[in-house]
Amino acid sequence: MCGAFEQHNKAMHRWAEILTDWPVDVQDRFDVRPTMNAGTVDARGYRERSWSLIPGWAKAPRLAYSTFNARAETVAEKSTFRSAWRKSQRCIVPVSAYFEWPVIDGVKRCHRIAGLDGLPLLLAGLWDTWVGDDERHTFTVLTTQPVSQIDWVHHRMPLLLDADNIAEWLHGSVDQASRLLTARTERRLSAAPFIMRPGSTGDLFADC
């Protein structure tokens, strides 16, 4: 599961060869939650979208927590995400870290999960556009089984892409992208206790 993350520009610009279109003047985001806006990168470049996917075929543009994550194991079949998947509407969601609240000694305690190398984590996502009286640009983050480094934090984690398979995810065929749904990141990760900024809820969202 992934229900909160941060996007710090300093981290993004350290990986300029991957995030070539990341704006220099975009605002840092310290606590992004579902339905909030975040930066994404698709085959055409950088785009801000709202987190929680609205299918293009939906009758009304309703953002729902239930669509902020999509299971990698079922994304190709689930009706909410199937159209975006078949149309190769894939994106990456670069984050400097994401957050989970494992229960420790009976208490939910916020932990910040990040790469030990300080470079952004590249979360696999899908995007869609709803068109009505206006346009709503939205995305979801794919989730998978956790790697052993952080399997004590939560029974799900974002599907992380490594630098050498970003091009295939963004520009490859559906069959090529399908092979990445079971990819296991080679990045070394850390999960450290973290105090959220004032105003953060620390809530856990529904499992995905």
Model-found features: residue ranges?
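Short linear sequence motif anchored by a di-proline
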Residues: M1-C208
